[in-house]
Amino acid sequence: MAETQVRNFNINFGPQHPAAHGVLRLVLELDGEVVERVDPHIGLLHRGTEKLMEAKTYLQAVPYLDRLDYVAPMNQEHAYALAVERLLDIEVPKRGQLIRVLYSEIGRILNHLLNVTTQAMDVGALTPPLWGFEEREKLMVFYERACGARMHAAYFRPGGVHQDLPDQLIEDIGKWIDPFFTTLKNLDDLITPNRIFKQRNVDIGVVKLEDAWAWGFSGVMVRGSGAAWDLRKSQPYECYSEMEFDIPVGKNGDCYDRYLIRMEEMRQSARIMRQCVDLLLGKERVGPVSNTDHKIVPPKRGEMKRSMEALIHHFKLYTEGYHVPAGEVYAAVEAPKGEFGVYLVSDGSNKPYRCKLRAPGFAHLQAMDFLCRGHMLADVSAILGSLDIVFGEVDR
């Protein structure tokens, strides 16, 4: 029988695909069911964030960062706040640092719960998302009680945080931690030993460590390949150097290892939260939560009713904003998805001259072709799930 040359088959994966995480469009070239080439088409959620920030004062630019990785909003604000603080050369008081660390870890748990449980859903398990979202709901309420918003918080401001936390809220966060370990154990027992989940994730999307560095990976993507690289340990910011926690590291660099790391990171985050809660209710119970320089941080309402000086400061801050000394700075935080960096250039005015955002998901998505080659079509959604991509930060 004569051999016939079969043409490769091109299909669109997304943008309306349930496993495509928002607005991702992948053009897949398939040979039968084997993926030969992946071409990610991005930009469907591009809003021009970096350009818009140039027309806003340093304070007005904060809410834009919530809308990048909108699964864990405060972690993005954190990098921006650190960048502005470095240019201004100001310190954040200890209580403010602890509140920031506490809420950064809440963000990490929010992110990992979503990722782990929806990854399980992508490969066919329907119970984990229901359990995970129940816990996320409680954490969203903590967000809301701190700043009034469930998602777009604008709570971390240059100089500290917007307002202090009431003791009752900190106690409630403390009460949430122990039952959460039980929830994690239930999730662990349900997903980790599951035969189907293992078959869908073990040896899928393997990344060697040198490849991970070459592609510009960070966060869970390099830790899954065996590097104990975590900015909270390697370049500590805020008060992470005083916290006790471990960095989980994988061996095989596959989807399953990355899942296990995210599970363990949630436990470590809860550990850090416990330490923060104890300090905030103990030796750091009273104290300022933001810098006391009223040329940068607005004065309290009570002061404005008594002092003309405070009223003038407030008026200047919310009309013109503060001027940041000329210079440039790069500040990075260990966001849940990897290294989130803000490269800020100031020309001495009240608005950023340029603000470049380094989104971890962008670097991870570019390797989609490299990761998927030779895998089956069904593995594409498993690999995509383990990359942990949110389009707000990829398209910006």
Curated annotation (Swiss-Prot):
InterPro entries: NADH_Q_OxRdtase_suD, NADH_UbQ_OxRdtase_49kDa_CS, NDH1_su_D/H, NiFe-Hase_large. It catalyses: a quinone + NADH + 5 H(+)(in) = a quinol + NAD(+) + 4 H(+)(out). It is a peripheral membrane protein. One of its GO terms (molecular function) is NADH:ubiquinone reductase (non-electrogenic) activity. SUPFAM superfamilies: HydB/Nqo4-like (SSF56762). It is found in: Cell inner membrane. GO terms for cellular component: plasma membrane. PROSITE patterns: COMPLEX1_49K. It comes from the Bacteria. NDH-1 is composed of 14 different subunits. Subunits NuoB, C, D, E, F, and G constitute the peripheral sector of the complex. Belongs to the complex I 49 kDa subunit family. NDH-1 shuttles electrons from NADH, via FMN and iron-sulfur (Fe-S) centers, to quinones in the respiratory chain. The immediate electron acceptor for the enzyme in this species is believed to be ubiquinone. Couples the redox reaction to proton translocation (for every two electrons transferred, four hydrogen ions are translocated across the cytoplasmic membrane), and thus conserves the redox energy in a proton gradient. This is NADH-quinone oxidoreductase subunit D. The gene is nuoD.
